[in-house]
Curated annotation (Swiss-Prot):
The lineage of its organism: Bacteria, Bacillati, Bacillota, Bacilli, Bacillales. It comes from the Bacteria. PROSITE patterns: RIBOSOMAL_L30. The gene is rpmD. Belongs to the universal ribosomal protein uL30 family. This is Large ribosomal subunit protein uL30.
Length: 62
């Protein structure tokens, strides 16, 4: 089974650089405490690393 990542926006993007805002938007997060599920792949991992201080990540098995 493929791993999935549950990503939750825990901190606001207000006052953050534009590249971080775009990364959060690309992950599909718009509101605080919103959670999205993505497949675990290098592209998603790279985006998470870029905004790791703004999100909480949990691995789930499906």
């Amino acid at each position: 089974m493929a791993k999935k990542l549950e990503i939750t926006l825990t901190r606001s993007v207000i006052g953050r650089p534009e590249d971080q805002r775009i990364t959060v938007k690309t992950l599909g997060l718009r509101k605080m405490h919103q959670t999205v599920v993505h497949n675990d792949n290098p592209a998603i991992r790279g985006m998470i690393n870029k905004v790791a201080h703004l999100v909480k990540v949990k691995e789930i098995e499906e």
